[in-house]
Amino acid sequence: MTRMLIVGPPGSGKGTQAEWISDRLGIVAISTGDIFRANVKGETPLGLEAKKYMDAGDYVPDSVTNKMVRDRLQQEDVQHGFLLDGYPRTSAQVNELDDILSAGGEKLDVVLQLTADDEELVRRLLGRAKESGRSDDDEKVIRHRLNLYHTQTEAVVVRYQKLGLLAKVDGIGAIDEVTDRIMAAIDGVRAAK
């Protein structure tokens, strides 16, 4: 069983790579962003609350996010492993995830960090906004999201690095090239254990 996280700044390719890697490893990819967007589209109470934060480029509060992740990780399809994208983003969420996993006698195996230059990420996200019409992808909001990543989520990365779980991977390049780099990085972390 493989339990993994994929982290990285907005636009670094986490969602795309999560799908490719989960297919290769035969595990389920879980995206908190997809779950939030589905709730927003369905106008659920969670979705309406989340939308306010998402439109401003802010993180959805831990109280909402933690409950959603806990519920998702208790579903049947994660029993063979998972690749979680978009969570945890804060130290408090790391603690919550540790609690969720340890309650089931589990722990993380690998944390993948996709890296990319901020200016490249802004270009990618502005292009995505034009293609998809996402309201949370204008340049001001994009730069705010990048700043949030650097100030909050990078502390999460440091924590996992200290635990020997982190594999840093350059997220720039063709999808299959990045996927190959990720698979090699996963093998490297597993071999070091």
UniProtKB/Swiss-Prot annotation:
Catalytic activity entry: AMP + ATP = 2 ADP
Binding-site residues for ATP, renumbered to this chain: G11, S12, G13, K14, G15, T16, R128, G173
Enzyme Commission number: 2.7.4.3
SUPFAM superfamilies: P-loop containing nucleoside triphosphate hydrolases (SSF52540)
Enzyme class: transferase
GO molecular function: adenylate kinase activity; ATP binding
CDD domains hit by this protein: ADK (cd01428)
GO cellular component labels: cytoplasm
Domain of life, per lineage: Bacteria
Keywords, comma-separated and alphabetical: ATP-binding, Cytoplasm, Kinase, Nucleotide biosynthesis, Nucleotide-binding, Transferase
Biological function: Catalyzes the reversible transfer of the terminal phosphate group between ATP and AMP. Plays an important role in cellular energy homeostasis and in adenine nucleotide metabolism.
NCBIfam families, per database record: PRK00279.1-3 (NF001381), PRK14527.1 (NF011100), PRK14528.1 (NF011101), PRK14531.1 (NF011104), PRK14532.1 (NF011105)
Full protein name: Adenylate kinase
Species for this entry: Renibacterium salmoninarum (strain ATCC 33209 / DSM 20767 / JCM 11484 / NBRC 15589 / NCIMB 2235)
Originating gene: adk
